Amino acid sequence: MADNEILQSTAVDAANEYDASEIQVLEGLEAVRKRPGMYIGSTSTSGLHHLVYEIVDNAIDEALAGYCSEISVTINEGNTITVVDNGRGIPVDIQAQTGKPALEVVYTVLHAGGKFGGGGYKVSGGLHGVGASVVNALSEWLVVQVHRDGKIHEMKFARGHVTEPMTIVGTTDHTGTTVTFKPDPEMFEETVYSYDILHTRMREEAFLNAGLRITIADERLASAEKPEEERRHSMCYEGGIREFVTYLNRTKTPLHDQVIYVAGQKGDSMAEIAMQYNDGYNETTLSFANNVHTPEGGMHEEGFRRALTTVLNNYGRKIKMLKDDEKVSGEDCREGLTCVISVKLTDAQFEGQTKAKLGNSEIRTLVNNIVADKLDTFLEENPQVGRMILDKALTANRAREAAKKARESIRRKTALGGAAMPDKLRDCNENNPELTELYIVEGDSAGGSATQGRDSRFQAILPLWGKMLNVEKARADKVYGNDKLQPVITALGAGIGDEFDDAKLRYHKIIIMADADVDGAHIRTLLLTFFFRFMRPLIEQGYVYSAVPPLYKLTRGKTTRVAFSDEERDAVSAELRGGNPNTKIDISRFKGLGEMNPHELWETTMDPEKRTLRRITLDDAVQADETFTILMGEKVEPRKEFIEKRAQYAVNLDY
């Protein structure tokens, strides 16, 4: 879609003029380049993509105010980004405090924007002006075009400074803003954008803003050969968060067809909740405040959870599924729940610049009241759905009680909760978890070699054996009772599920060391599924790693080398031949970790000075949840489609 198609005419409410008087200056821009992490979280790929979110958030602020219906995001050749909206256009008249055009103030002064006085925006997630100036400060160059008042105004910047003052470059009958920028390679570890990451975020924004159309396109030459559906998406969801829940549950089996939707408003604050139960055991709750994802929850989630538990307990007693002295816990009520909570409020109090948690206590009361009132009405009007939900909560309650008994049984066996460790654990001498590593090793043979080859001062070894439980298909009671997972739980010492306590964690590096074959990949996946579902903070805090053992052993005479890929094998082979193609090189493929002697295992896979570790990260919880459900869940067809689509990317697999 061409830019001028996005920049459609938009009527402006004369009673709520958006001009330079709405732009207030609070402080300067100097600190951004010195401490970028304070403003965008990090200078890794996460921070790189955050630049795009900041500009898009500003466009969505226009949508929230009722002035924008279309946004486009384009990844251009050279990994520059263009964001176009058909809002009112950033003000270009003179801002009174500075005597400069408001456009210049917005892009060069931190905390200069239309959010702070309450006139420009009643609801804002992007803090219009904060994100704009930060993106400018961290860009090698940035160009803004504003279509407003019949004219096209253009201004150019570099690393936070004006390089070309605002000029009029044409006329227009549209309104809106076009921003193009190039991330500064001096500031970022990586400057290549991921279409998939941006597409996922833009899809989320489209779900949260019913009727807003967001288009994303990848125009890089390297992407030209990809099919259209992999490099261009246009998204508009009239059903809003109801469609979001349907999307999240598409790989699961819903218990009821209808997505439950409740909404309400008090003053300038409003909340909407969409929810649907599935036959799984895991909760997926996504919460947002002014379109900003709050992964650590906050008051809106507290209000929802409190009301949900109260409503289901009261309803259960009313229909005699619960006795007067019986109750189901909040955890029981949320088993198999997929829920999206979206609140809009005038003065959102986020914890931290990255806005991970919402702190407004008044929104807890609003959400609680909406759910308490309207969910109760829904259950009364839909008794069949109500009974299905209660039945699932009761089943979860029984499983939780069974898990509690299993835990207590384990504690009794370990000297009333003492520190008795698994028999197979070969612990280290160091007690400080910040300095210790736990290698979870596939097989007793490799476990023996690892034990002999390790540095026992700080490296602990736990061998795994036999078939491991797929926790995607199991409740907590089965997990606690599983003889393959119990040693892992006990060795780590932090508990699982709602009882997980990272203060009790015994190791801050948990390294999965499995064979470089299909079986090894399966074991890694089973362990990661377990960590994701029952010990997610381990992944969120960056404690989980995958070891990278060598694939090949190359020998020439008394010289032995190893290679970690086919490419490295060929390079090492050529090096050992020394330009003589007739030199004999013995090349063997390691079939498993157990083939390596203790010295080889230490030298290649365990020595902190030489080894390669891959940290397991969680950038997108929704995508991770979906992937684990597809790969490890009950449904075969989604798994088949997933594998077929990605088969071309499979490497280093032995069949």
Where are these regions (language model features)?
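Residues immediately C-terminal
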Residues: D61-E62, G89-I90, V518-D519
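Short conserved segment of the HATPase_c
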Residues: I90-G113
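C-terminal interaction appendages of subunits in large macromolecular complexes
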Residues: R398-G417, N432-E437, G448, Q452-R454, ...
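Conserved short strand/loop->alpha-helix "switch" segment adjacent to the catalytic nucleotide/phosphoryl-transfer site
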Residues: K34-Y53
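Mature N-terminal segment immediately following signal peptide/propeptide cleavage
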Residues: A20-R35
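Gly-rich Lys/Arg/Thr-decorated short loops/hinges at beta-loop-alpha junctions or inter-strand turns
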Residues: R35, V179, W465-A476, Y480-G481
